[in-house]
Structure formats: C-alpha cells, structure tokens
A protein has these predicted regions:
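Eukaryote-biased intrinsically disordered, low-complexity acidic regions enriched in Ser/Thr/Pro
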Residues: 28, 32-65, 71
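A broad, low-specificity signal marking well-ordered, structured residues that form hydrophobic/aromatic
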Residues: 2, 20, 72
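Short, extreme N-terminal segment that most often corresponds to the first beta-strand
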Residues: 2-14
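Ser/Thr- (and often Asn-) enriched beta-sheet segments in non-cytosolic proteins
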Residues: 6-8, 26, 53
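Short, compact, well-ordered microdomains
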Residues: 54-92
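Long, compositionally biased charged/polar stretches
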Residues: 18-26
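Intrinsic-disorder/low-complexity regions
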Residues: 14, 22, 83-84
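Absolute protein N-terminus
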Residues: 1-2, 92
Length: 92
C-alpha cells in the first residue's frame, strides 16, 4: 500500500487551505519514494483507484478530481469535520 505522507504547497501558499494550491505530494510504499507533482498523482489514482491512502486516520483514499478551470488535482474523503485529510499532512 502506498501512502501520501507530506505535501509541498505552491510558492507563496504555504498556509493555504486549498487543495488546488498543493504542488507536490510525498508518496511512500512505492519503488521510488519521493515527491510527485499533483497531476502525476492524479493520473495514477485515476488509473489505480484505492492505491494511495492519506497517512492520517482514518486513512482515506486519495482520489482524482478536476477543477472548474480543468486543473488536475487530488483530494481525499473529508473527515468528520469536513476538512480534507490531505491538508492535515505535514508541509515542507
């Protein structure tokens, strides 16, 4: 199983609470752990649903999404408070 363990936001957006501002996601449990651009992660989970989970309880799946401006991004199931667990990961 692969896990998203931390995120990098776009320059100037370190404190953003927008999934669209995520630039890269650190993935572990794969042959080459490291940071991957969000569009690469988007394509992977689109082709392989359920293959990456957020490393925050309750470990929701990372799923693909497309913004109204046709920008590829990823998200997870919101937690009980309506907050996406992907945004709870440590930031660099």
């Amino acid at each position: 199983m692969m896990f998203a363990t931390k995120i990098k936001m776009k320059p100037g957006c370190h404190n953003s609470h927008s999934l669209l501002e995520i630039d890269e996601i650190y993935i572990t449990g794969c042959a080459t752990p490291g940071y991957y651009k969000k569009d690469i992660v988007h394509d992977h989970v689109k082709e392989n649903p359920g293959s990456i989970q957020v490393n925050v309880w309750p470990y929701p799946d990372v799923v693909h999404a497309v913004s109204v401006n046709r920008e590829k991004y990823v998200r997870s199931s919101p937690n009980a408070y309506g907050h996406d667990n992907l945004l709870s990961l440590p930031r660099e």
